[in-house]
Amino acid sequence: MTGPPRLSSDLDALLRRVAGHDQAAFAEFYDHTKSRVYGLVMRVLRDTGYSEETTQEIYLEVWRNASEFDSAKGSALAWLLTMAHRRAVDRVRCEQAGNQREVRYGAANVDPASDVVADLAIAGDERRRVTECLKALTDTQRQCIELAYYGGLTYVEVSRRLAANLSTIKSRMRDALRSLRNCLDVS
């Protein structure tokens, strides 16, 4: 197959070939789905490192369990995105459990100079500041930032998604980041 799959049936066929351990089919399946999977995982985890690691785990699971895909129950993309969402949510739960353990065990050794409430308030304030600064951007700048940083897309993918020249996207991103830096008073 050449070019992106036109129908979900193209991905279904690729996934069936992956079930037979066809490496070329796996590479093609990965190429056609990686942005969607990474974007979904990034929206759930909001951490680049964890998102990359989780995405890698998802594709390892695809390689091992492609034979479990049943096209009668849904499309290959739906199967993959469901798997990705579940894996990302599991990662969040695992991290939360780890954080709760750290809180329980660390409570006895609290540094009196540390103020958890103040730290949380500062983090919330920073989030609000970023949100306000994003609102100050033009619609096109905000759209570029959201696709690249929250959607996990590369500049090339953003330019394709918005049907704009790559140089235009780079200019919008540069201007948007400069505006955000100025708005947030970051040097």
Curated annotation (Swiss-Prot):
Residues 155-174 bind DNA. Residues 30-96 are annotated as: Sigma-70 factor domain-2. GO terms for molecular function: DNA binding; sigma factor activity. GO terms for biological process: DNA-templated transcription initiation; regulation of DNA-templated transcription. Keywords: DNA-binding, Sigma factor, Transcription, Transcription regulation. Gene3D superfamilies: 1.10.1740.10, Winged helix-like DNA-binding domain superfamily/Winged helix DNA-binding domain. CDD domains: Sigma70_r4. A motif (Interaction with polymerase core subunit RpoC) lies at residues 53-56. InterPro entries: RNA_pol_sigma-70-like, RNA_pol_sigma-70_dom, RNA_pol_sigma70_r2, RNA_pol_sigma70_r4, RNA_pol_sigma_r2, RNA_pol_sigma_r3/r4-like, WH-like_DNA-bd_sf. GO terms for cellular component: peptidoglycan-based cell wall; plasma membrane. Induction: Autoregulated. Residues 133-182 are annotated as: Sigma-70 factor domain-4. Belongs to the sigma-70 factor family. ECF subfamily. PANTHER family: ECF RNA POLYMERASE SIGMA FACTOR SIGK, RNA POLYMERASE ECF-TYPE SIGMA FACTO. The sigma-70 factor domain-2 mediates sequence-specific interaction with the -10 element in promoter DNA, and plays an important role in melting the double-stranded DNA and the formation of the transcription bubble. The sigma-70 factor domain-2 mediates interaction with the RNA polymerase subunits RpoB and RpoC. The sigma-70 factor domain-4 contains a helix-turn-helix (H-T-H) motif that mediates interaction with the -35 element in promoter DNA. The domain also mediates interaction with the RNA polymerase subunit RpoA. Interactions between sigma-70 factor domain-4 and anti-sigma factors prevents interaction of sigma factors with the RNA polymerase catalytic core. Extracytoplasmic function (ECF) sigma factors are held in an inactive form by an anti-sigma factor until released by regulated intramembrane proteolysis (RIP). RIP occurs when an extracytoplasmic signal triggers a concerted proteolytic cascade to transmit information and elicit cellular responses. The membrane-spanning anti-sigma factor is first cut extracytoplasmically (site-1 protease, S1P), then within the membrane itself (site-2 protease, S2P, Rip1), while cytoplasmic proteases finish degrading the regulatory protein, liberating SigK. Sigma factors are initiation factors that promote the attachment of RNA polymerase to specific initiation sites and are then released. Extracytoplasmic function (ECF) sigma factors are held in an inactive form by an anti-sigma factor until released by regulated intramembrane proteolysis. Sigma-K controls genes such as mpt70 and mpt83. Interacts transiently with the RNA polymerase catalytic core formed by RpoA, RpoB, RpoC and RpoZ (2 alpha, 1 beta, 1 beta' and 1 omega subunit) to form the RNA polymerase holoenzyme that can initiate transcription. Interacts (via sigma-70 factor domain 4) with anti-sigma-K factor RskA. This is ECF RNA polymerase sigma factor SigK. It comes from Mycobacterium tuberculosis (strain ATCC 25618 / H37Rv).
